[in-house]
């Protein structure tokens, strides 16, 4: 005893959660575009992601292998099992999808792209001769075979049996749409009277084929709700009546298997709205108006991002019928929304120091701008402007325009001196060593054997010296994709990006406060335990955190 559509309903809910950013625990960065997702979904779909998400919550993808628009389609396929391409499934789009699928080790998507590229009729243009098996191509059979009224009546009978199933759900592959569209176009060009007689059958499918093929600016894949039992079953009588019908319907079992094994689905509402009215004249006029209205829109918005597309009224209605429509940005808006926000003492330092206000000495005493990741509900998509300038919040359609815009900012705006998560513990230890060195030089209580060759500062161990020497390096090959700040190590850059994205995986069991770094949590726990491991060698003062000791040591070294 089971629910037939339980899996699809569950996947639909997960996709809606992804669109709203609910319970998303991983960020995928593609150039400057950020996509939120769930680790368990990615791990179940991709071997590549499965090996990465165990170690980090932030994943940077190779921009030579995948771009933001292609990865959005990949992510939609992972969450829905459907491909709704804004390029009408062109060769270029499938090649890009195949490259990305192979790179991310999505074997089902890669196999689907290979089959589609193999089936594409454009590959036959390079072969003017007939195929090796002696049969003419499907396109040639469709365009050269005349259609008789008897054939149309058979199609009309089969259409009646299918209407009831379409009212429930209907999944059509791209091959079905192409075959039916071509079949009806041939019928109208060869026999106008035939199209009138069979308007309920073939012309209905012509409207269906036109409507679906023109629907390049697709809506939300997260809102389409499809039952697995809705795969249309073709009538054997209609499939065997004529050569033209066999040309259209012989492909259906194959495409149905392709749809079942490698989902490439379309929602039920799209088929319901495209059913022709009984009146033939009214049907013709409405179809002409629909063509005139949709043709410029589909051309004007070709290549536009799916979530920001203003769909025709008919398509919007279909999506509402198919499922609950998400607000403004339906395609699982995977991009992260940011808000520039000024706070005192950084993301976590201000909270920690407020907890320890009785003993903590506020070393900075300054306002620093931090970029705070805001995940409050669902916000409108950025549309074409995938590349966002974090300091001012402006979006740009290309990375070149973003880079040109970033150069207009002053250095102070982009490289804000803030108490970064990466500065401690190693860099703070270096500063503490420097201050202690000055103190010991005055009091003569300790000797340092390891000296810096650049500034002659000395340290008591080589590890601290190496960390100090990195501050003199001029090359910083790892930039932050969000603010542009440069780092000498990849791990340091990754930890820095957590401050932008608001990823705080470490939580205090006592009070629930969350932190981006493990050592921050360890320091915070001392507030509850009362431990003070950092002691001043001059006056014996003890502190819970090392930065408080640094502030205290400055008092001893200051001229006053």
Swiss-Prot record:
<feature type="compositionally biased region" description="Polar residues">
    <location>
        <begin position="183"/>
        <end position="203"/>
    </location>
</feature>
<feature type="compositionally biased region" description="Polar residues">
    <location>
        <begin position="243"/>
        <end position="259"/>
    </location>
</feature>
<feature type="region of interest" description="Disordered">
    <location>
        <begin position="183"/>
        <end position="367"/>
    </location>
</feature>
<dbReference type="Pfam" id="PF00651">
    <property type="entry name" value="BTB"/>
</dbReference>
<feature type="zinc finger region" description="C2H2-type 1">
    <location>
        <begin position="387"/>
        <end position="409"/>
    </location>
</feature>
<protein>
    <recommendedName>
        <fullName>Hypermethylated in cancer 2 protein</fullName>
    </recommendedName>
</protein>
<dbReference type="GO" id="GO:0003677">
    <property type="term" value="F:DNA binding"/>
</dbReference>
<dbReference type="InterPro" id="IPR036236">
    <property type="entry name" value="Znf_C2H2_sf"/>
</dbReference>
<comment type="function">
    <text>Transcriptional repressor.</text>
</comment>
<feature type="zinc finger region" description="C2H2-type 3">
    <location>
        <begin position="478"/>
        <end position="500"/>
    </location>
</feature>
<dbReference type="Pfam" id="PF00096">
    <property type="entry name" value="zf-C2H2"/>
</dbReference>
<feature type="domain" description="BTB">
    <location>
        <begin position="24"/>
        <end position="87"/>
    </location>
</feature>
<dbReference type="GO" id="GO:0006357">
    <property type="term" value="P:regulation of transcription by RNA polymerase II"/>
</dbReference>
<feature type="zinc finger region" description="C2H2-type 2">
    <location>
        <begin position="450"/>
        <end position="472"/>
    </location>
</feature>
<feature type="region of interest" description="Disordered">
    <location>
        <begin position="122"/>
        <end position="163"/>
    </location>
</feature>
<feature type="compositionally biased region" description="Polar residues">
    <location>
        <begin position="126"/>
        <end position="153"/>
    </location>
</feature>
<dbReference type="GO" id="GO:0000981">
    <property type="term" value="F:DNA-binding transcription factor activity, RNA polymerase II-specific"/>
</dbReference>
<keyword id="KW-0863">Zinc-finger</keyword>
<keyword id="KW-0677">Repeat</keyword>
<feature type="zinc finger region" description="C2H2-type 5">
    <location>
        <begin position="534"/>
        <end position="556"/>
    </location>
</feature>
<dbReference type="GO" id="GO:0008270">
    <property type="term" value="F:zinc ion binding"/>
</dbReference>
<feature type="compositionally biased region" description="Low complexity">
    <location>
        <begin position="224"/>
        <end position="242"/>
    </location>
</feature>
<dbReference type="InterPro" id="IPR000210">
    <property type="entry name" value="BTB/POZ_dom"/>
</dbReference>
<keyword id="KW-0678">Repressor</keyword>
<comment type="similarity">
    <text>Belongs to the krueppel C2H2-type zinc-finger protein family. Hic subfamily.</text>
</comment>
<keyword id="KW-0539">Nucleus</keyword>
<keyword id="KW-0479">Metal-binding</keyword>
<keyword id="KW-0805">Transcription regulation</keyword>
<dbReference type="InterPro" id="IPR013087">
    <property type="entry name" value="Znf_C2H2_type"/>
</dbReference>
<dbReference type="InterPro" id="IPR011333">
    <property type="entry name" value="SKP1/BTB/POZ_sf"/>
</dbReference>
<dbReference type="GO" id="GO:0005634">
    <property type="term" value="C:nucleus"/>
</dbReference>
<feature type="compositionally biased region" description="Basic and acidic residues">
    <location>
        <begin position="296"/>
        <end position="308"/>
    </location>
</feature>
<feature type="compositionally biased region" description="Low complexity">
    <location>
        <begin position="348"/>
        <end position="362"/>
    </location>
</feature>
<keyword id="KW-0238">DNA-binding</keyword>
<keyword id="KW-0804">Transcription</keyword>
<feature type="zinc finger region" description="C2H2-type 4">
    <location>
        <begin position="506"/>
        <end position="528"/>
    </location>
</feature>
<keyword id="KW-0862">Zinc</keyword>
């Amino acid at each position: 005893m089971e629910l037939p559509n339980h899996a699809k309903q569950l996947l639909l809910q997960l996709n809606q959660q992804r669109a709203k950013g609910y319970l998303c625990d991983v960020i995928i960065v593609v150039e400057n575009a950020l996509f939120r997702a769930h680790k368990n979904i990615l791990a179940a779909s991709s071997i590549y992601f499965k090996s990465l998400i165990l170690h980090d919550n932030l994943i940077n993808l190779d921009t030579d292998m995948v771009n933001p628009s292609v990865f959005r389609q990949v992510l939609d396929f992972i969450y829905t099992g459907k491909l709704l391409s804004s390029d009408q499934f062109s060769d270029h789009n499938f090649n890009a999808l195949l490259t990305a699928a192979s790179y991310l080790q999505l074997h089902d998507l890669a196999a689907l792209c290979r089959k589609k590229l193999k089936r594409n009729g454009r590959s036959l243009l390079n072969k003017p001769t007939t195929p090796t098996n002696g049969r003419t191509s499907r396109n040639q059979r469709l365009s050269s075979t005349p259609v008789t009224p008897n054939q149309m009546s058979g199609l009309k009978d089969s259409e009646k049996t299918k209407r009831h199933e379409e009212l429930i759900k209907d999944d059509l592959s791209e091959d079905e749409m192409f075959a039916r569209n071509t079949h009806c176009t041939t019928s109208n060009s060869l026999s106008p009277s035939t199209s009138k007689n069979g308007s309920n059958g073939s012309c209905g499918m012509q409207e269906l084929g036109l409507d679906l093929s023109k629907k390049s600016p697709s809506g939300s894949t997260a809102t389409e709700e499809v039952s697995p039992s809705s795969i249309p079953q073709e009538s054997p009588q209609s499939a065997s009546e004529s050569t033209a019908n066999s040309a259209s319907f012989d492909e259906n079992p194959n495409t149905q298997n392709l749809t079942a094994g490698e989902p490439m689905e379309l929602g039920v509402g799209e088929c319901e709205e495209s059913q022709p009215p009984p009146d033939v004249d009214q049907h013709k006029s409405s179809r002409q108006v629909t063509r005139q209205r949709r043709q410029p829109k589909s051309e004007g918005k070709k290549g536009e991002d799916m979530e920001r597309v203003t769909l025709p009224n008919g398509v919007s209605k279909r999506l509402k019928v198919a499922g609950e429509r998400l607000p403004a940005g339906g395609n699982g808006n995977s991009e992260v929304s940011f808000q520039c926000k000024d706070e005192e003492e950084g993301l976590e330092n201000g909270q920690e120091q407020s907890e320890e206000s009785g003993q903590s000495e506020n070393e900075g005493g300054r306002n620093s701008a931090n970029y705070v990741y805001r995940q409050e509900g669902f916000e409108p998509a950025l549309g074409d402007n995938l590349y966002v300038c974090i300091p001012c919040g402006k979006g740009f359609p290309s990375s070149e325009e973003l880079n040109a815009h970033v150069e207009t900012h002053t250095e102070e705006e982009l490289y804000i001196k803030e108490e970064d998560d990466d500065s401690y513990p190693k860099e703070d230890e270096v500063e503490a060593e420097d201050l202690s060195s000055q103190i010991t030089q005055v009091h003569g209580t300790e000797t340092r054997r390891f000296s810096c060759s650049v500034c002659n500062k000395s340290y008591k161990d080589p590890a601290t010296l190496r960390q100090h020497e990195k501050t003199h390096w001029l090359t910083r090959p790892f930039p932050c994709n969000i603010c542009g700040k440069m780092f000498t190590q990849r791990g340091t850059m990754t930890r820095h990006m957590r401050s932008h994205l608001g990823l705080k995986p470490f939580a205090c069991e006592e009070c629930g406060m969350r932190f981006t770094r493990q050592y921050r949590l360890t320091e915070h726990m001392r507030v509850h335990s009362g431990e003070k491991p950092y002691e001043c060698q001059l006056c014996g003062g003890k502190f819970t955190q090392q930065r408080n000791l640094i502030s205290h040591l400055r008092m001893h070294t200051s001229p006053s």
